[in-house]
C-alpha cells in the first residue's frame, strides 16, 4: 500500500534543575566590606516566592514551568509556592504511521519542597498518550483517544481516559 508511511515528526527533551538556588557563597557585610562565607544553604533564593511582589506567579499559577508547584493546589489556603526545589526530566514525541497520529508525553520529577520547608525527595511520574486519526469517509472529522496517568509520592496516583471527536467547518 503506497499510503503506508511512518515517521517521527517531533521530539522534545527537557531537563530542569532548581535544587541549588544561587550557590553556596553568602556575602556577610562587615562595616562596608562584603566578606564571602561558605554556606550550603546560602542561595535560598526561594524561587517563585516573594513577599513584596507576586514574583513568577499570576492569579495563583506559576509562570514558566509546570514543575514548580502552583499555589492553586496547596492543601492549606496559602498563596506561596511550597515546592520550588525540583529536578525534572521531560520527554515528548509525535509519531505518525499510516495516517494515525500518536503523541507521548512523559515526565519524572524529584520534588524537595523549599529550603525553609523541605519535604525530602518525593518522586513523581506523569504520562499522557494520545492516538488520533482523520476519518476519510466523514470529511473533516478527527477522532482521538487519550490516556493520562500519574504515579508518585508527591501528587499521588491518578488515571484518566478521554475520547474526542473534532469536526472542522
Label the predicted regions:
Residues 1-169:
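Outer-membrane beta-barrel pore domains
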